[in-house]
Amino acid sequence: MLFRSRERGFTYLLCRTSNPESAELQGLRVAGGGFPDEPLYVRVARLAAGRPEALAGRIGLVVGATAGEALRTARAVAAGLPFLVPGVGAQGGDIAAVLAAGQATAGRAASRFGGGLMINVGRGVTDAAREASDPGAALSAAAGEWCSRLAILPPDGLPPAANE
């Protein structure tokens, strides 16, 4: 795997998208390299989790919200990596299911607010402006709604480390 040679920065690797066609490539079985026969997305998660950059907290995986079983499997293989999770909102990903299947169980990501998950909502916000007489107000309202549904900060607004 190639990564930037810089010692700082962060890279998200595409692991498993949730569109139905993704299984055609990301679900291909791969074998060899001292690893078990497994789907390609699992191999990506396994290789990413074993990288020195993972221990340094500089690698995460993109795993789609509507690919529930794949999210659970990727989390089992890459327990400590942060996940960027698109597909909540217009694509129909379920927040509760993502939280149940995707929270980090080890490493730096597990100790962060949000359980190592960064849930992305795009069209769920931007689609609100399509037919609105005041697109700005519609975007603001939709963003506010999603922010309240995805809130990860404690009521005082700051993670404990920031309060210390």
Language-model segments: which ranges?
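Electropositive phosphate-/nucleotide-binding environments in soluble metabolic enzymes
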Residues: 35-42, 68, 92, 133-140, ...
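Non-catalytic alpha-helical scaffold/packing segments enriched in small hydrophobic residues
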Residues: 39-47, 57, 69-73, 97, ...
